[in-house]
């Protein structure tokens, strides 16, 4: 049954077991006006993990020579501040076969992965995992510093990889598996995926919309 924005129902398995569920319609997140940006904020100070928190007891992230380094698969890492709309600059480097990701508001993953010279897919470098496909493969490959410049306004996202726009003002339909939560209308942190293996990040700068930090 649908009541306003909430859907309630029952699923019956082939074995006859019944399971009730409740779902809430995803918000449209339409903005009435173009964003007014606040001053840029450096999220990583190059010295320690101030402003960040590991998800889980075992934290393998370290600040090494100005680089936020994930030395092995383990805990994910999130900012302690939460954001609504923003522009994000972040530089990253992965080893051969590396796999990580940058979750926007902790819910929408921009994939970081070594995909070689393959044709782009939504789970390849720069894609919005599971949803949006980059229009071109402009990866520099493993063991080389690369850059993302990402703009997120409501559900609309633009991703530039190494200075080339590969996703241009497209709508993100939903959340990525592994998201922190499904509360899409709420502010959320920047979330760096660390559970797959080694990866490094540096020069992480966010420009939030005015009054868009919690």
Regions found by a protein language model. Name each.
Residues 1-214:
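Carbohydrate-interacting regions of secretory-pathway proteins
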